[in-house]
Amino acid sequence: MSALNKLLLYLVLPVILLVGGAAATVYLWVNGPLALPTERVDILVPPGSTPSSIAQLVNQAGVPLNVQGFVALARLGELDTKIKAGGYQIVRGDSPLTVLRRMALGDVTARQITFVEGWNLRQIRAALAGHPDIKQTLAQVSDADLLKRLNTLGQAVSLEGLFFPDTYIFPIGTSDVELLERAARTQQKILDRAWAARAPNSVLKNPYEALILASIIEKETGQAADRARIAGVFSNRLRINMLLQTDPTVIYGLGEGYTGKLRKQDLLSDTPYNTYTRLGLPPSPIASSGRAALAAALNPEKHNYLYFVSKGDGSSAFAVTLPEHNKNVATYILGRKP
């Protein structure tokens, strides 16, 4: 071998090895198994998702995935515009390429169900019963037995309000009870965090009271901007031992007896949930409450308002005194100018 050839070999070989090593590294990453924290991880891909946003969702779910690498892989494979929305499962052994191809094919092996903020237990049960991919077992379990299993608070008197409103992804054949257990665990975690972050002077005595008040706030709030202020009204009333006088609790107490329009006789009809006839909070939540309602219940706006009324556009008018409130009622409910 000539001196020139030796020189060329010394110069070129490291480059070849470097390129080859890099190619091997890329190949192993593209086809190698992802590190999952559990046997499977559920991912909900919203409509309009990009490879970048999907990679971020995967990372948030506890699965390390290089965002730039995933984006490059999608573009090189011309799969970036083919990704379909839906619920997907990542299982042990899946590689970045496997996940990407599954989403491009729309291989939605998982199903999903959504519990909406403000739904009551009856509505949640109906959603579960109407889902074709959920195993129906609730008929075999009494509410009392289910409450024993799910009452992590130790103070709940009913199942109402124990299930966090969210979208849950699950494999076909998951039972309704399993989904309720999952929603209850989620609610407990979120409630624990909200309780830990409560205002130091909160009028609420325990997390269950927070869940009860949050459910009322959830039903009373028409616009998000009013949520903390509405929470402040109820906190002020509780603090001075004033009737809460909130219609949603009355409606809940009427149950199937509610005709769709609240009448004066309904407000006078005493039930454990009638906050026009009974002081304090009702015995249980009246609906499922989201994060924002819980945060408002535990960190209400500080003010002197004791009254509020809906303006008819989703927002509310607030008042400190009853005469001021009556003017607001005349303006927004009775249609009279002040």
PLM region descriptions:
Residues 10-23:
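Hydrophobic membrane-insertion alpha-helices, especially the h-region
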Residues 22, 27-191:
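Signal peptide-directed extracytoplasmic domains
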Residues 1-7:
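Short, Lys/Arg-rich N-terminal segment immediately upstream of the first membrane anchor
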Residues 50, 126, 130-135, 149-338:
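Bacterial extracytoplasmic/cell-wall-associated proteins, especially those involved in peptidoglycan
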Residues 9-13, 40, 81-82, 119-123, ...:
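Short low-complexity stretches enriched in small and charged residues
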